[in-house]
């Protein structure tokens, strides 16, 4: 199995993204893909996340990261077949191929910004700046609620992935607003792919309900994963997935 074969088997064709979509991803660093999940799929995922949050309790998210003011879950690859779409959807994988070339899933997590919480400083999802075009990581936000200005929609600085700097290099306080920032709003079921070198951050949830999303994070194949999929893959998960999905996860068997 190789990248081209895996993507072909998962339905990724050369025209899975339009020229305009590729241009927007290159220029702005983000691309909304509407209607990726149906209302039924969104409802089923939210139900499963609520179940997992209740079962895991204080340990929820520990496999990767816990964050004050949020409900987080990690290692979702192993926790329900509903989550397979996040590393198998042709449009999303086509966007990852456009940004990264040869890639793998780094982690699949959920994040719910709780009421009165969720504000983050602007940051990039990488440890250091990279030269424009030499991108190493790319993320996708799977909207499980409508993202609005009131409930903590993600803010980004369009084009900042091409600056070759980090927010702290140019801002006295990355928690402040940036004059060029915009909010990524959209309907539940939308997926927003964004170059992880793009400056971004959550905003304050000023409603009385959590703002829920999945994050499917991808990286170049030579990089370590945020969660070592090979070390965590369960037998039942491995057995239900296809060889192409195994390749996207970079797993070759079970331990």
Each predicted region: which residue ranges?
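Non-heme Fe(II)/2-oxoglutarate
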Residues: 2-11, 55, 191, 198, ...
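Non-catalytic surface loops within mature trypsin-like serine protease
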Residues: 114, 144-146, 218-220
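Short, surface-exposed loop/helix-turn segments at secondary-structure junctions
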Residues: 122-125, 169-178, 208-210, 229-234
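A short beta-loop-beta micro-motif enriched in histidine and acidic residues
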Residues: 125-137, 179-180, 186, 209-210
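Active-site region of the double-stranded beta-helix
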Residues: 127-134, 144-153
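Double-stranded beta-helix
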Residues: 147-203, 223, 235-240
